[in-house]
């Protein structure tokens, strides 16, 4: 039998990528990877290491000890071989810290959101999501097979109207507690009241609230709403706790259900022991060094003053609106050239016309570092970028 006939392919099936790349480049929306050195040579105002714990010696030692005891990997799904005492200890301690009855670890904050939203909804459910909800919550809504209503940012009346007009038996309201792009706070008390009027569940992503608001325990705890039976929290271990992983925190019945029903939990390898050990140690540091959350907010306020941002920051995030993506890129590059690394948010991360510098404060910023930030940010924002603000 002869060799199969080769049909020539005149056009690569990936040729369309070239056109997409050109469009992104022309719009100033290309992204690239830039490895960071093991010892930073620039002032970091871009990472999510809010409490400065990723390099804390106790946190590193917690990860090292877990590696020595449990090995490098979890070795499998937590339902098979990937569960350890360490995982369950962190779940219990984190739940107690935020005032929840129980917790369940996931491999990231992203998968925690997928697991919670998809696992607690499905066909015949209504999901009401804030327009600025994190991408992981957006993707969870898409995967849920539920009907989804996206409401304007922080618009409680729109949420109430969506719940009031529903035909579905089950409903869920989804929001960040602290919105990542601009650092604004969700109206959690009002959202919970709307949920209770219409028998809906409230799911809150505390990724940017944990370690910063409520003395570290999160915005829900700060408002006196922790432990509510109709609220589920999600969070990440990769921001304030300086490690990696995610968690769903809420009633014990939710934990039990997600173990049975959350596909990102069932079919994913358990969180690596080193990450669990580091996060557990970080939680211990957060409890012991209670000055850290307040220092984050104080440093954020100082950064906002430097950048002439009129709103008082309510979180670690300071958003400097520049509008045009090319202007934002140029400003971020100028800061980096001067020794200060800042975030640069452009579409599709933020809406068109709202490209910005995103600064994140850390508890561990020294007076000398704040002075460097003042000098560089003032020079950059009073330069070419200022004309476009």
From Swiss-Prot:
EC number: 2.3.1.47
SUPFAM superfamilies (UniProt xref): PLP-dependent transferases (SSF53383)
Coiled coil: none
Disulphide connectivity of cysteines: none
Organism superkingdom: Bacteria
Keywords of the record: Acyltransferase, Biotin biosynthesis, Pyridoxal phosphate, Transferase
Residue numbers of N6-(pyridoxal phosphate)lysine PTMs: 239
Residues that, per the record, bind pyridoxal 5'-phosphate: 109-110, 180, 205-208, 236-239
Leader sequence residues: none
UniProt subunit comment: Homodimer.
Pfam families the record matches: Aminotran_1_2 (PF00155)
Keyword Transferase appears in the UniProt entry: yes
Enzyme class: transferase
Family: Belongs to the class-II pyridoxal-phosphate-dependent aminotransferase family. BioF subfamily.
InterPro entries, per the entry: Aminotrans_II_pyridoxalP_BS (IPR001917), Aminotransferase_I/II_large (IPR004839), AON_synthase_class-II (IPR050087), PyrdxlP-dep_Trfase (IPR015424), PyrdxlP-dep_Trfase_major (IPR015421), PyrdxlP-dep_Trfase_small (IPR015422)
Binding site for substrate: 31, 134, 349
MF-aspect GO terms: 8-amino-7-oxononanoate synthase activity; pyridoxal phosphate binding
Protein name per the record: 8-amino-7-oxononanoate synthase
GO biological process, one term: biotin biosynthetic process
Cofactors named for this entry: pyridoxal 5'-phosphate
Annotated pathway: Cofactor biosynthesis; biotin biosynthesis
């Amino acid at each position: 039998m002869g060799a199969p006939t080769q049909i020539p392919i005149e056009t690569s099936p990936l040729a369309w990528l070239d056109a997409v790349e050109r469009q992104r480049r022309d719009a100033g929306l290309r992204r690239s990877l830039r490895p960071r050195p093991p010892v930073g040579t620039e002032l970091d105002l871009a990472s999510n290491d809010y409490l400065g714990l990723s390099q804390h010696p106790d946190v590193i030692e917690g990860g090292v000890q877990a590696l020595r005891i449990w090995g490098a990997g979890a070795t499998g799904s937590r339902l098979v071989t990937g569960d350890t005492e360490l995982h369950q200890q962190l779940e219990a301690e984190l739940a107690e810290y935020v005032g929840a009855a129980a917790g369940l670890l996931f491999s990231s904050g992203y998968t925690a959101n997928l697991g919670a939203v998809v696992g607690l909804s499905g066909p015949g459910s209504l999901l009401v999501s804030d327009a600025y909800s994190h991408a992981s919550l957006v993707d969870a809504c898409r995967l849920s097979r539920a009907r989804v209503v996206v409401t304007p940012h922080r618009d409680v009346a729109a949420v109430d109207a969506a719940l009031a007009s529903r035909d579905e038996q089950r409903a869920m309201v989804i929001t960040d507690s602290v919105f990542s792009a601009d650092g604004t706070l969700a109206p959690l008390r009002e959202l919970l009241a709307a949920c209770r009027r219409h028998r809906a569940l409230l799911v809150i992503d505390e990724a940017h609230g944990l370690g910063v608001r409520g003395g570290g325990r999160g915005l829900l705890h700060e408002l006196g709403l922790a432990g509510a039976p109709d609220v589920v929290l999600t969070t990440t271990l990769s921001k304030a706790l300086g490690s990696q992983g995610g968690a769903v925190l809420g009633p014990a019945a939710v934990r039990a259900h997600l173990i049975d029903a959350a596909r990102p939990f069932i079919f994913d390898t358990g969180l690596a022991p080193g990450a669990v050990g580091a996060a557990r140690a970080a939680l211990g540091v957060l409890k012991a060094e209670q000055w850290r959350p307040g220092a984050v907010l104080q440093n954020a306020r100082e950064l906002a003053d430097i950048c002439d941002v009129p709103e008082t920051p309510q979180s670690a995030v300071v958003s400097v609106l520049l509008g045009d993506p090319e202007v934002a890129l140029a400003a971020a590059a100028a800061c980096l050239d001067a020794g200060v690394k800042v975030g640069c948010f452009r579409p599709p991360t933020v809406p068109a016309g709202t490209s910005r510098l995103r600064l994140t404060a850390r508890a561990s910023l020294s007076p000398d570092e704040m002075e460097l930030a003042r000098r560089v940010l003032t020079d950059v924002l009073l330069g070419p970028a200022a004309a476009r603000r």
